[in-house]
């Protein structure tokens, strides 16, 4: 099974084609807003909810993170996906946006997943980023 992490950069409905029926979806903070255009429901919502209010949904697992922390919400979600044993992670809403440091951090998150043996892909409407490991 694959984990899809939805970060906060807005995504277009055309990315819905990337989703699979058995994907496990983690929405990070304002990334929850990306569920509507993608037509999906998250399995877990997590974040410090500094950029969007904590959604109130029945039957959703919600993990509230502290406001002061060393990792981004997306990094926390990636670590959670790795701990749950996913071998593939697709990050949507992780490229672009108003803050370049978030894009750079998300690239580092993808690399961190790869270093833990998890195949990572960051994708938006214009770009698809994967990582080539030594020996491939």
Language-model features: locations:
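General beta-strand structural signal in soluble alpha/beta enzymes
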Residues: 6, 26-29, 47, 63-64, ...
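Class I SAM-dependent methyltransferase SAM-binding "motif I" and its flanking Rossmann-like core
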Residues: 111-136
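Internal, active-site/partner-interface "lid" segment
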Residues: 94-101, 128-133
């Amino acid at each position: 099974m694959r984990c899809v992490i939805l970060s906060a950069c807005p995504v277009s409905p055309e990315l819905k084609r990337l989703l699979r029926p058995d994907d496990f979806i983690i929405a990070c903070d304002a990334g929850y807003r990306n569920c509507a255009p993608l037509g999906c429901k998250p399995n877990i919502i997590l974040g410090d909810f500094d950029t969007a209010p904590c959604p109130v949904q029945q039957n959703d697992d919600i993990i509230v993170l502290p406001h002061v922390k060393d990792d981004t919400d997306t990094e926390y979600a990636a670590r959670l996906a790795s701990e749950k044993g996913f071998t593939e992670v697709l990050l949507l809403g992780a490229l672009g946006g108003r803050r370049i440091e978030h894009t750079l951090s998300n690239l580092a998150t993808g690399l961190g997943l790869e270093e833990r043996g998890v195949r990572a892909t960051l994708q938006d409407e214009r770009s698809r980023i994967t990582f080539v490991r030594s020996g491939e």
